[in-house]
């Protein structure tokens, strides 16, 4: 079952992840179902004393068209296969189709938001710039998920500046 949240409910439920979302609904921009953890699973992976801590099992993302908001929680374990899967959770075509259901003669605001491990990125614009908004959202999502703080290590931090190659001398 797909849930579109309207008006003040969207703001009140902006941080809520506990709802059942179906995949590929007729108006949904998302191609994957909601994968929110169960209440028990959520409690096992979160510290109740720190309400700002994200669940390390995945990330949340949303698309908003005017007053209508579609949300997903997706599992992500920071492997290449998992990254490839979640990058396909929506496409420019699926977003365009979903957004077109809410467009009238006037321009409406469109917003993409993603939150992963305490970092939140929001990209917004008007419905006339939706294609550019989708491109920026895809780039933001990919960069955020690939640059997880634990995995960030540049060539410089390993003592080898970019563009420098190391050659070993063959022994005789």
UniProtKB/Swiss-Prot annotation:
Ordered alphabetically, the record's keywords are: Host-virus interaction, Inhibition of host innate immune response by virus, RNA-binding, Suppressor of RNA silencing, Viral immunoevasion
Disulfide linkages recorded for this protein, renumbered to the chain, are: none
List the molecular function annotations (GO) for this entry.
RNA binding
* A GO biological-process term: symbiont-mediated suppression of host innate immune response
Q: Using the UniProt annotation, give all residue ranges assigned to the region (Disordered).
A: 1-37
Q: Name one GO cellular component term.
A: virion component
Q: Does the keyword RNA-binding apply?
A: yes
Q: Name one Pfam family in it.
A: Tombus_P19
Q: Where is the composition biased (Basic and acidic residues)?
A: 1-20
Per its database record, what is this protein's job?
A: Viral suppressor of RNA silencing which binds specifically to silencing RNAs (siRNAs). Acts as a molecular caliper to specifically select siRNAs based on the length of the duplex region of the RNA.
Subunit info? Homodimer.
Please give the family membership noted in the entry. Answer: Belongs to the tombusvirus protein p19 family.
What is the name of the protein in this document?
RNA silencing suppressor p19
Which organism does this record belong to? Tomato bushy stunt virus (strain Ja9)
């Amino acid at each position: 079952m797909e849930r579109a949240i309207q008006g003040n409910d969207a703001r009140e439920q902006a941080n809520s992840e506990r709802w059942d979302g179906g995949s590929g609904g007729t108006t949904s921009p998302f191609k994957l179902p909601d994968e929110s953890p169960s209440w028990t699973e959520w409690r096992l992976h979160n510290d109740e004393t720190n309400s700002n801590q994200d669940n390390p099992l995945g990330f949340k993302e949303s698309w908003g068209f005017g007053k209508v908001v579609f949300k997903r929680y997706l599992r992500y374990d920071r492997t290449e296969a998992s990254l490839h899967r979640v990058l396909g959770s929506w496409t420019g075509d699926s977003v365009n189709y979903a957004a077109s259901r809410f467009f009238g003669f006037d321009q409406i605001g469109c917003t993409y938001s993603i939150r992963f491990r305490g970092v939140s990125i929001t990209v917004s614009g008007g419905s006339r710039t939706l294609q550019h908004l989708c491109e920026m959202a895809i780039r933001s999502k990919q960069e955020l998920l690939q640059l997880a703080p634990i995995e960030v290590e540049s060539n410089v931090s390993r003592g080898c500046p970019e563009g420098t190659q190391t050659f070993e001398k063959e022994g005789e």
